[in-house]
Every structure is written in C-alpha cells, then in structure tokens.
Amino acid sequence: MTSSLGPHNEVIDLKKIITQLDAETYNGLETDFLKTKADNSLYLLKTFRNSYPKDEEIISSLKINPSSLYTLKSRLYDKIQNKLSKAESLTEEELLNQVNQIHQICYNNSKEISVAMLTKLEENLLKNDMHGELLIVYSALKQLHLFTEKYYYYSQLYNKQIAFNLTTEKAIEILGNFNRLLMQYDFSK
C-alpha cells in the first residue's frame, strides 16, 4: 500500500507540512519531543519551522548519514500524523467519526496536512479491517491529487476498493442463498 512517506516512496514536503501546522499542534509535538528526549527530531522540527535548510546542512549539523536523515524524516512524519489524528489507536466509533469529518479535514486544512491526516486514517482503517470506509478516504485522496501524478495511483486504489466491496457483497449473497437452499433441503426430508 502506502509507506509513511507516501505512495511509491515519494518524499512528502515535510517543511511545508511543519510550517502549516497550527501553534497548538506544533507546541504539542515540541513538548512530546522534549519529554522523550528526541533531540534530533526536535532539531528537525524546529529547523523546518524556522528556516529552509538543505539536507546536506542537516546531515552535517546532526552528524548523521543520508539514510539516517531519511529515517528521521519518516519518523517525524509519522509523529505528525499521529498528532494530527489525535490518537494512535482509535476505536471503530472514533474512526467512523473521523471518516464523517473527511470533508471538514479537506476544506479546513492545507492539502499537505489533509493528505497526512487521510493517509493516517487509511492506515487505521486498514488495521481495523474497515474496508467500506476506505472508499471515502480514497475518494478524498483522489480529489486532493486531481492535478498531480498521484491521481492515477489513488484512482487505482479507489477502483480496487470498489471491486473488493462488490466481491464481498456478492460472496455474502451467495452464502445466504446457499444457507437458504440447505435449510430448504433439510426441512424437506
């Protein structure tokens, strides 16, 4: 499916997301990193919020290699997604509430933040085996990527989800018919 940095391992513009975070979310992330002593993540968060450094500058100041920077960005993106979705493990009812708020998420936030929230919601729905609700998420992701190369990717996921839902419904219908015929056979003896 999708990795934490987006479909096809494309790097999300983390700088853009961090600069668009509201003060409450940003301060919450900062506090979390201070509590857990995640100095590198805190440095990356503050640096992206206040300036636009090149990856080479970050690598030299943190004294890490490029693959470590990629991992650090990926983990920071995951933390931002968790903070935006307000919880790491949600009940089915809370997930349904988030699905019902998809239009609010898309219209009240920037595209980057909306995509981050929706990909986290997609991950949670997949974990909880809530495939019917994924249609709504993929539809929203498809609309958000209308004029990008990712449109085709989300369109394919949407179509795949429709096929899955139709197949599931047909299988349930066939099972019901089989049980009805089996019951008629048993009663006819």
What label would you give each PLM region?
Residues 1-188:
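Flexible inter-repeat linkers and adjacent short helices
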